[in-house]
């Protein structure tokens, strides 16, 4: 099986894939809290506990991290505990197969690149990829599979934290309120989070369609992923598909591309 590791600021998503290519399937997956102080040894222990059984079942590892301290420990862990299997960490210089048509390709986060690859292989192009993570990103993928750039906005959770810290409002459960107009503070905050971010994304996608002719037609797929996607997607008028494990699938594809390159 292939182990995939997606480290973000808020959480770490892990998945085990069986098979390859079009026959690959996600057998098991987990999400754990991100600790920026996590050491390589601690991360290895967590993985062993989650995977269970013989570690020999893992024949390869593909990973990314948008958290620099964890990225360093991730590299150390792979070298220390998984050196016997092929592994790929998505960072500048790693072959992804996605041309980055932007001013500075090194600025583009590995998560955005991997999502673009997965979306293009799954749905073709053109596509718009929305990731509801710590940040909310809206990225464009051309019909040729090129990354054309995108939009970065605050994430749902981080916006809520800002309200708590700066406005003195209390922490509330993120859930769909009864109405867009809240009758109390809790529902008002929930409305801003759920309907506000649905409107944000819908507005951005409408503007993208207006500005770029290649994204104005019915052949464009708008796909969403990310930890807050289940909350926002049902309220969106523009999102076509929800792929909860898009990033893990993208890591699988990057791994396969790099393995093919080693064999040629």
UniProtKB/Swiss-Prot annotation:
Keyword hit for Cytoplasm: yes
EC number: 2.7.1.33
Cofactor binding, per record: A monovalent cation. Ammonium or potassium.
Catalytic activity as recorded in UniProt: (R)-pantothenate + ATP = (R)-4'-phosphopantothenate + ADP + H(+)
Localization per record: Cytoplasm
Pathway: Cofactor biosynthesis; coenzyme A biosynthesis; CoA from (R)-pantothenate: step 1/5
Residues annotated to bind ATP: 6-13, 134
Active site (catalytic residues): 111 (proton acceptor)
One GO MF term: metal ion binding
Keywords: ATP-binding, Coenzyme A biosynthesis, Cytoplasm, Kinase, Metal-binding, Nucleotide-binding, Potassium, Transferase
Cross-referenced NCBIfam families: baf, PRK13318.1-3, PRK13321.1
Subunit details: Homodimer.
Name this protein carries in UniProt: Type III pantothenate kinase
Gene name in the database record: coaX
């Amino acid at each position: 099986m292939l182990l995939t590791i997606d480290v973000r600021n808020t959480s770490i998503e892990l998945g085990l894939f069986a098979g390859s290519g079009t026959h690959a399937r996600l057998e098991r997956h987990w999400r754990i809290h991100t600790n920026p102080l996590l050491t390589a040894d601690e991360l290895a222990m967590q993985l062993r506990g989650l995977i269970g059984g013989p570690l020999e079942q893992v024949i390869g590892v593909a990973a990314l991290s948008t958290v620099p301290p964890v990225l360093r420990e991730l590299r150390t862990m792979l070298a220390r505990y998984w050196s016997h299997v092929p592994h790929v960490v998505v960072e500048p210089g790693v072959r992804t197969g996605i041309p980055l048509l932007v001013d500075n390709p090194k600025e583009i986060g590995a998560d955005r690149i991997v999502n673009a690859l997965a979306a293009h292989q799954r749905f073709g192009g053109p596509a718009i990829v929305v990731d509801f993570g710590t940040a909310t990103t809206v990225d464009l993928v051309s019909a040729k599979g090129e990354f054309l750039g995108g939009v970065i906005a605050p994430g749902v959770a981080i916006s809520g934290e800002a309200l708590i810290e700066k406005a003195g409002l209390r922490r509330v459960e993120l859930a769909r309120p009864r109405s867009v107009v809240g009758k109390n503070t809790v529902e008002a905050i929930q409305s801003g989070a759920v309907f506000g971010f649905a409107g944000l994304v819908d507005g951005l996608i409408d503007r993208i369609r207006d500005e770029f002719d290649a994204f104005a037609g019915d052949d464009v797929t708008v796909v969403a992923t990310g930890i807050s996607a289940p909350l926002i997607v049902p309220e969106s008028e523009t999102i076509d598909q929800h792929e909860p494990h898009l990033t893990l699938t993208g890591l699988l594809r990057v791994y396969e591309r790099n393995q093919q390159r080693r064999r040629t």
